[in-house]
């Protein structure tokens, strides 16, 4: 979702044939990073590295709902949990966002937008700088709040475009950081929509602001006041859990939050969750759980059922398979025995036809085959010889017939 900020922006026409940038914007007319204006002559922007977190430093965050601001009747010198969250929002640049120019506040996509729920301030190099800037601005704000409280309360704010601003009185100390956001109060959304957690919970006794807010803060050394602990705390923006409630439950939650929204007894309990966005979250651990779609789960279940049925069939009929194997083996043995008997009888018949081994009942098969070969060759030679003798006798007969015919003709 694009943002409209007060920083000057220029139109860049990238030549995609020669320039292949690492970051692509949804609209080329908007450029969020002023550092890219100095690198317009270069062919390739720098590769994503440790400098990537400088581009995400101090991104503007949307203002909170005015429902909680109207009940900020903080008369004590120490701000409550809701005050601290609003101060962090303002110090991180909440006044730079024009809420009405982004989208409709009643739109569901605006409620579930990534900018509201995760500003990606949990980086490596930006965390230290963010902590330093927030601590300095927090100290400056507290000093100006103590000195110029009445002056800030008497300063008139700009007229709001929607509902009137919070009434003055006990909440005059909060006017210093609320008068700049009065114009954007009409575009705010309900606190129960953005923060689905109930506001009536209380932390354990003795828990610090970091424990109530659910932020990651290092343990501070004991012995200091609450101001020193708040200044030394490491502030980390956490991700809000997505609200999956219906519209009726949202309205009832909004009414309950307005009734129970008090400055000292309304800690916002935030929890970390993983948001699937296009930007890679380097700090999140790798997820090992694999979720399959419904169709794939049905296929896997059907495959398992088929495997179980086949296993049951195999287990239920072991005797049938064994009997079939035994029958096959028995048939094979009978056929093999018959083949061997026929082969033996054929050898015996061949042996009886050979005169050399006819009377030798113990003659081996190899000897029988050799003698049979020799006998066949001898028979073939005798055949050729007899054929030649027959041909000679036929010729002799023809000669004798011709000679007899001549003798008969001479006598006549």
Swiss-Prot record:
Residues 144-173, 208-264, 309-328 are annotated as: Disordered. Pfam families: HLH (PF00010), Myc-LZ (PF02344), Myc_N (PF01056). GO terms for molecular function: DNA binding; DNA-binding transcription factor activity; protein dimerization activity. One of its GO terms (cellular component) is host cell nucleus. Keywords: DNA-binding, Host nucleus, Oncogene. Residues 309-320 have a biased composition (Polar residues). Residues 386-407 are annotated as: Leucine-zipper. Residues 156-169 have a biased composition (Pro residues). Its main location: host cell. Residues 225-236 have a biased composition (Acidic residues). Residues 327-379 form the bHLH domain. PROSITE patterns: BHLH. The keyword Transmembrane helix does not apply. It is found in: Host nucleus. Residues 239-255 have a biased composition (Low complexity). Gene3D superfamilies: Helix-loop-helix DNA-binding domain (4.10.280.10). Transforms avian and murine macrophages and fibroblasts as well as murine B-lymphoid cells. This protein is synthesized as a Gag-vMht-vMyc chimeric protein. The sequence shown here corresponds to the Myc homolog fragment of the chimera. Efficient DNA binding requires dimerization with another bHLH protein. This is Viral myc transforming protein. It comes from Avian retrovirus MH2. The gene is MYC.
């Amino acid at each position: 979702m694009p943002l409209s900020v007060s920083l000057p922006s220029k139109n860049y026409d990238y030549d995609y044939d020669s320039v292949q940038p690492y970051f692509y914007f949804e609209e080329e007319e908007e450029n969020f990073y002023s550092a890219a204006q100095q690198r317009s002559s270069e062919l390739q922007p720098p590769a994503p590295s440790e400098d990537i977190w400088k581009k995400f430093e101090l991104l503007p965050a949307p203002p909170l709902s005015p429902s909680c601001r109207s009940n900020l009747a903080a008369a004590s010198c120490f701000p409550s949990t809701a005050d601290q969250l609003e101060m962090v929002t303002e110090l991180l640049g909440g006044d730079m966002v024009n809420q009405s120019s982004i989208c409709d506040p009643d739109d569901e996509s605006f409620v579930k937008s990534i900018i509201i729920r995760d500003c990606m301030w949990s980086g490596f190099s930006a965390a230290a700088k963010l902590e330093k800037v927030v601590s300095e601005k927090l100290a400056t704000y507290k000093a100006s709040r103590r000195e110029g409280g009445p002056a800030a309360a008497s300063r008139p704010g700009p007229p709001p475009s929607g509902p009137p601003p919070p009434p003055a009185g006990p909440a005059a100390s909060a006017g210093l950081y609320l008068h700049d956001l009065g114009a954007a109060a009409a575009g705010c959304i309900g606190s129960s929509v953005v923060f689905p957690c109930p506001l009536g919970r209380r932390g354990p006794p003795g828990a610090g602001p970091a424990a109530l807010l659910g932020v990651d803060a290092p343990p501070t050394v004991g012995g200091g006041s609450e101001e020193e602990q708040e200044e030394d705390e490491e502030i980390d923006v956490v991700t809000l859990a997505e609200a999956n409630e219906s519209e009726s439950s949202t309205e009832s939650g909004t009414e309950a939050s307005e009734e129970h929204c008090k400055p000292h007894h309304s800690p916002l309990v935030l929890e970390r969750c993983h948001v699937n966005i296009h930007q890679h979250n380097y700090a999140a651990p790798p997820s090992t759980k694999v979720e399959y779609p419904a169709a794939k789960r049905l296929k896997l279940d059907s495959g398992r059922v088929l495997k179980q049925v086949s296993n049951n069939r195999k287990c239920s009929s072991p005797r049938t398979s064994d009997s079939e194997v035994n029958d096959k083996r028995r048939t094979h043995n009978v056929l093999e025995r018959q083949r061997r008997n026929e082969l033996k009888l054929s050898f015996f018949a061949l042996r009886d036809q050979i005169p050399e081994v006819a009377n030798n009942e113990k003659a081996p098969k190899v000897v029988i085959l050799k003698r049979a070969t020799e006998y066949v060759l001898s028979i073939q030679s005798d055949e050729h010889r007899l054929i030649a003798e027959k041909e000679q006798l036929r010729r002799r007969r023809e000669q004798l017939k011709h000679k007899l015919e001549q003798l008969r003709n001479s006598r006549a």
